[in-house]
Design a protein with these regions (language model features):
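Hydrophobic alpha-helical connector segments
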Residues: 35, 48-77, 128-132
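Helix-turn-helix
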Residues: 2-31, 35
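Amphipathic alpha-helical packing segments from all-alpha helical-bundle domains
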Residues: 89-117, 126-133
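Hydrophobic/aromatic-rich alpha-helical bundle segments in the mid-to-C-terminal region
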Residues: 115-160
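Short, flexible helix-adjacent loops and helix caps
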Residues: 3-4, 49, 53, 76, ...
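Short, hydrophobic secondary-structure boundary micro-motifs
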Residues: 78-83, 89-91, 119-123, 148
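Helical hydrophobic small-molecule/effector-binding pocket
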Residues: 61-83, 97-98, 108, 146
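Generic hydrophobic, amphipathic alpha-helix propensity
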Residues: 11, 36-40, 44-48, 107
Length: 168
């Protein structure tokens, strides 16, 4: 996403397929965007988890923090939020959409992998994953009113506490 409006017809042309084929595959522009964002998010968080190495709560925190910082600095995502705010929030934060459920599942898989390696948490992995994703959504996308939008440092502190680490 280079900061331009996403044109499904142009994407279909670039892929050498008919617009009708794109429509059959994804039905709507919103679903196409959701699939792209979800796939990128799943891949990126897995890559970052692998990159930080280590095990346990600190490894999870470092992976989540790296992911959050990338999102906070993603120009294409910022452009989408600025130009199509309602659509972007619906895509990114709706439990009925594509992105949020898949990101919760991706975070849950990371937590469960750490649990198999000995990490213990007071919360069930699905609940912890949901809380981590929803907090990131609030801090990164839609809490400018509370003055926390883009504040990845405070987000890290809260995620640390959820993971059982000292938030300081």
């Amino acid at each position: 996403m280079a900061g331009e409006r996403i044109d499904v017809q142009a994407i279909a042309r670039e892929l050498g397929i008919a617009r009708a084929t794109m429509h059959r595959w994804f039905r709507t522009r919103e679903l196409l965007l959701g699939e792209v964002l979800a796939e990128l998010g799943e891949q990126r968080i897995a890559i970052l988890r692998e990159r930080v190495g280590g095990h346990g709560a600190l490894a999870l925190l470092d992976a989540f923090d790296a992911f959050n910082r990338e999102l906070a600095g993603a120009e294409g995502l910022r452009a989408l939020l600025a130009s199509e705010h309602e659509l972007a929030l619906r895509l990114l934060t709706s439990s009925a959409g594509v992105v949020q459920p898949r990101m919760v599942a991706a975070v849950q898989r990371l937590i469960e992998a750490e649990q198999r390696a000995g990490f213990e948490t007071a919360l069930a992995p699905d609940l912890l994953a949901y809380a981590i994703v929803r907090l990131a959504e609030a801090f990164l996308y839609n809490d400018a009113v509370a003055g926390v939008k883009g504040d990845t440092q405070r987000l890290r502190q809260i995620e640390a506490a959820l993971l059982g680490l000292d938030p300081a």
